[in-house]
């Protein structure tokens, strides 16, 4: 994740440095990236909530089981124990459904992440293409500077020659 952030930062720095505008591709990428990050956070929150439900339910069931021994009336104890088993069965079914729904999030997030990466890499390819035109501009500037320097050298050589005469 740190590498992904670093890579993203590199593209951002390049964009600012080069005044590069990725146009619609960049807009779509940024929107999709934001949606992915929000979806990823929401999925993590769902997992946290399911874990909390399990933790609370475990504590409640432990307490219920412990308190069964406190009954003095065997009939009430049997009825409560039966209700405990029934409730645990229904709870297990509920948790199974929640975990099944949770498991379906991962492939969807993976597909969304793949799309985000694909758009990003296409954006990077386009940005690298922009580097070529920047390189050509720098190369022209360098050639012009070299020509001006050669001209200045010729002029200074001519001046030095005229001083010797």
Model-derived regions, located:
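N-terminal Sec/ER secretory leader and immediately downstream segment
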Residues: 1-48
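A structural signal for long alpha-helical coiled-coils and helix-turn connectors
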Residues: 11, 15-18, 65-68, 72, ...
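Extended amphipathic alpha-helical interaction segments
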Residues: 49-129
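Amphipathic alpha-helical coiled-coil segments
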Residues: 3, 38-50, 86-104, 141-153
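Short, charged, amphipathic alpha-helical segments
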Residues: 26-34, 77-85, 129-136
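Long amphipathic all-alpha helical oligomerization modules
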Residues: 99-165
